[in-house]
Amino acid sequence: MRVNEIKAGVVGIGFIGVAHVEALRRLGVDVVGVVGSSPERARAKVESSSLPGVYESVGALAGDPEIDVIHIASPNHAHTDQVRTVLEAGKHVVCEKPLALNADDTADLMRRAESSGLVNAVCFNIRFYPANHQAMALVAAGEIGEPRLITGSYHQDWLLLDTDWNWRLQPEEAGQLRAVADIGSHWLDLTSFISGKRIVEVMADLHTLVPVRRHPAGPVETFATVDDTTELIEEEMTSDDAAGILLRYEGGARGAVTISQVSAGQKNSVRYEVAGGKSALGWHSAEPEDLFIGHRGRANEILSRDPGLYAPEASKLIAYPGGHVEGFPDTFRALFSQVYADVAQGGPSETPTYPTFADGHDVVLVTDAIAQSDREQRWTTVQR
């Protein structure tokens, strides 16, 4: 089967679901239909956009014999049951992070996926900026020496105001962790991917900095703002707006990260530095084309995205020549291109080049340890 013969469906048509549809179309995948939070809301959105037709339910989508792959981009609480439905129907599946709300469920989904022989992936798309694959290749080749210190941040501002609202603020839909699970999970996955080291212990301090929020009675799109004339309801908040986390990685490397969705002016700012015994690597999502390489005894370097200068595993992600900027939407295309190469061959490669349910499970093990560490205010071991 060729990639342009594959048919897909997408569950969830908010901000991220639409990003999935757009990336799949760039690959030539036929997106047959979508499922929304309700058929009525989905039809209204389809009528005002270029989205495909609406299916009544995940079961109906999974039951369509024409569909080969289903993407789950719905609110977090729905992932477990929806992924099970898709796997039971014999469809390949791509799920947004977090894979599920707890490690028991992620372990179950991982086992089901592995025993099914179906392609399974978790959408840790930030790995797929080419600079981040280049960083991974440099670390793996020993160019920076053994990683010693891994630091950084993931900051946003879209939940700064007490009138900012989204389903992610509701624990019954998003889980008890919010900033850590929503965006921190990307950073945790990314730094383990680059360093080749899993996180083994954590010490976390989580903060609810906006204790009471005012919101409309109905749903609010991700990153949307509330109109001044809207009648608002007050609700107490319990999930984390921000976090500071100390980390210990395999092999002895130490780490520290701050995570925030209430940092004014930071729209979607991801940063890391991996300091090794020879040199250091650094990257910032605001300048995604450039990888910083720091040296002690000679001039520092900025390695810009260029397929002729990058390692093979990084250059194959690049769709345009150097100097033609690629960004956030391109990470989905790059990730899905690797997933769909396996779909086209009928099943997962022996060593997939994309994050699988095993990676999704491992990140939830880490975030579970972060939640426990904050509750108990102590160092906590990741339970593998």
Outline where the language-model segments fall.
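N-terminal Rossmann-like dinucleotide-binding module
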Residues: 1-49
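C-terminal helix-rich "cap/oligomerization" subdomain common to oxidoreductases
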Residues: 1-3, 69-71, 284, 324-325, ...
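Beta-loop-alpha module in the N-terminal Rossmann-like domain of NAD(P)-dependent dehydrogenases
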Residues: 49-112
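Hydrophobic residues in well-ordered beta-strands that form the structural core
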Residues: 95, 120-122, 151, 283
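Rossmann-fold dehydrogenase core element
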Residues: 108-126, 145-149
